[in-house]
């Protein structure tokens, strides 16, 4: 009888452990780190796949209008864009008591993080949110276990990404990343000036120069190439 009780308790503890494990979700800043995370750290992790720093957005994240606009910006079909929305699908179930966010501090990651936080506000996520800032090159943690309080990010999203204005309140977001977002889109910004001043160089030389200068922006090679083509065309 005693053994039976112990076995029942063990089963209950095991089920409790499984339930607790299933309640935790990790959201990463892209496929590259996500693959590293699942192999080296472990746990259920999904990547947030977007390039919010490019193009425009609308008020409601992942609305039909948002998807249509973002698909056009990223030059993919709406179906292809939807196929990359694993975060949206998982979060819409709203079953996780704790979500860990793993993002970098560069502009690319910060604008994506902003959109994600707004989506969490939209679905009225009530669980615990913990942010870990990472180095996107070494994957080392820069800052850990930052408690994130929702409720302020919708306004920040509207101010920064729609009205193109830097508010005083930024929550957990990095002020420098927001500044560089505006610089990235400025015809007189650091990157635009760099391209214009080196227009006589070959495209490969200019690309290397731009990538080296834009580490804090977090730009991809493709983004850098688009930026070069844009400013060389209008210069």
Could you describe each region identified by the protein language model?
Residues 192-194, 212-235:
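Charge-enriched amphipathic alpha-helical scaffolds
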Residues 21-23, 96-98, 126:
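A general structural motif
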Residues 75-91:
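Glycine-rich, highly charged phosphate/nucleotide-binding loops
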Residues 142-210:
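A conserved mid-domain beta-alpha-beta active-site/ligand-binding segment of alpha/beta enzyme cores
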């Amino acid at each position: 009888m005693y053994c039976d009780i112990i076995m029942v308790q063990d089963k209950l503890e095991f089920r409790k452990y499984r339930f607790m494990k299933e309640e935790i979700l990790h959201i990463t800043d892209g496929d590259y780190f996500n693959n590293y995370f699942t192999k080296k750290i472990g746990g259920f992790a999904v990547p947030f796949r977007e390039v919010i720093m490019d193009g425009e957005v609308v008020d409601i994240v992942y609305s039909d209008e948002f998807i249509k606009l973002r698909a056009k910006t990223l030059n993919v079909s709406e179906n292809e864009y939807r196929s990359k929305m694993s975060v949206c699908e998982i979060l819409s179930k709203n079953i996780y008591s704790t979500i860990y966010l793993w993002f970098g501090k560069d502009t690319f990651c910060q604008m994506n993080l902003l959109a994600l936080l707004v989506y969490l506000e939209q679905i009225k996520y009530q669980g615990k949110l913990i942010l870990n800032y990472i180095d996107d090159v070494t994957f080392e943690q820069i800052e850990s276990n930052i408690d994130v309080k929702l409720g302020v990010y919708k306004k920040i999203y509207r101010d920064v990404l729609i009205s193109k204005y830097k508010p005083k309140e930024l929550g957990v977001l990095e002020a420098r990343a927001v500044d560089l977002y505006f610089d990235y889109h400025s015809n007189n910004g650091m990157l635009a000036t760099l391209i214009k001043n080196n227009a006589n160089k070959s495209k490969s030389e200019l690309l290397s120069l731009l990538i080296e200068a834009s580490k804090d922006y977090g730009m991809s090679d493709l983004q850098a190439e688009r930026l070069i083509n844009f400013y060389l065309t209008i210069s």
